């Protein structure tokens, strides 16, 4: 791809990102005005958010008086669907801004890495598809209404992570300069991942626990991964626990767009495996070519993915704030370091 062709694609991505961001803002306004934002009934916060919340509280304690820091930390680390809404909108707003910065930096510079990184940034906008879930919810949530939007989201999440991984793998290979073919392969793999990832659209409650102890099933209920008949009434199903023992649990339809994920363990490992392999690929590039700026890019990529991971949860205000900070700051460092590589050459 030539510089002029790449610039046209990035410019189109900026326009598309701005359009998708505008649609997300309209969706958010519709959700808030119609009272469709669901109440969060789950207090089980993932380990990454626990760690982020504790770090955020230490920062607040250092900056503010102890009483004010504790009260603010209690609000910022409590699960909230409002923070999820802001995380979705913030992710969509970050994409066109970072793409504009990328285009200005590389307007006259050719870099294969940046072509794939722009694909990553463009894919971030499709987190806004999650806003269709509270809009589609009308008292009962069918399998189709819940699964289709989240399969779209999972496709673009997978494509974004694979694009980051490909940016380091294909940076210096002459044979893989056919970026269109590589992107097609990445889209195919991302589609297969999203198609066969189990999407859960229900809550599961153990009878001995209250609503505050709600958990998400890690095992599929059916072949499609969700309840076939969602009537709004509690149902009793039999599933296998981690110890391979059948356990009776109460199941209620899920209406919280925060938790429309696939299998959590797979989702988590996919993010962190991509982070490690992406950093390793740029580290190998830096060692092979003896260019120190590639080491900076390698160090920035795990923080980019960590910020993205926090924003996909967006479960607390601390996760939302830290995620936006990491995503934008690390992306700027990555773009600047790759730009210095090609200016130096």
Curated annotation (Swiss-Prot):
S-S bonds: none
Keyword annotations: Cell membrane, Membrane, Transmembrane, Transmembrane helix
Residue stretches spanning the membrane: 9-31, 84-103, 116-138, 148-170, 182-204, 269-286, 291-308, 313-335
A cellular component annotation (GO) from this entry: plasma membrane
Bilayer topology: Multi-pass membrane protein
Chief subcellular location: membrane
Signal peptide limits: none
Compartments where located: Cell membrane
UniProt keyword annotation of Transmembrane helix present: yes
Protein name, as recorded: Uncharacterized protein TP_1003
Species: Treponema pallidum (strain Nichols)
């Amino acid at each position: 791809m030539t510089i002029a062709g790449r610039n046209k694609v990035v410019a189109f991505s900026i326009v598309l990102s701005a359009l998708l961001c505008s649609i997300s803002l309209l969706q958010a306004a519709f959700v808030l005005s119609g009272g469709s934002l669901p109440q969060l009934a789950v207090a089980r916060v993932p380990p990454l958010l626990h760690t982020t919340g504790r770090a955020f509280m230490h920062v607040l304690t250092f900056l503010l008086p102890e009483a004010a820091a504790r009260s603010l930390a209690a609000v910022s680390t409590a699960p909230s669907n409002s923070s999820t809404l802001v995380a979705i909108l913030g992710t969509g707003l970050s994409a066109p801004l970072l793409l504009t910065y990328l285009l200005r930096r590389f307007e006259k510079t050719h870099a294969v890495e940046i072509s794939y990184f722009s694909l990553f940034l463009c894919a971030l906008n499709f987190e806004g598809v999650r806003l269709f879930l509270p809009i589609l919810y009308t008292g009962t949530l069918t399998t189709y209404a819940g699964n289709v939007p989240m399969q779209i989201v999972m496709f673009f999440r997978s494509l974004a992570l694979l694009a980051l991984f490909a940016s380091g793998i294909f940076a210096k290979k002459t044979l893989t300069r056919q970026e269109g073919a590589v992107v097609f392969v990445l889209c195919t793999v991302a589609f297969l991942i999203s198609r066969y990832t189990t999407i859960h659209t229900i809550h599961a409650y153990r009878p001995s626990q209250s609503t505050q102890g709600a958990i998400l099933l890690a095992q599929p209920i059916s072949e499609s991964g969700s309840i076939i008949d969602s009537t709004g009434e509690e149902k009793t199903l039999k599933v296998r626990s981690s110890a391979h023992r059948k356990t009776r649990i109460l199941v209620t339809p899920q209406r919280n767009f925060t938790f429309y994920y696939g299998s959590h363990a797979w989702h988590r490992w996919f993010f962190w495996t991509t982070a490690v392999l992406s950093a390793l690929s740029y580290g190998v590039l830096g060692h092979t070519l003896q260019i120190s700026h590639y080491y900076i890019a390698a160090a920035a990529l795990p923080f980019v993915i960590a910020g993205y991971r926090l924003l996909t949860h967006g479960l607390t205000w601390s996760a939302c704030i830290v995620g936006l900070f990491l995503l934008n700051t690390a992306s700027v460092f990555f773009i600047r370091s790759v730009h210095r590589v090609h200016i130096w050459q």
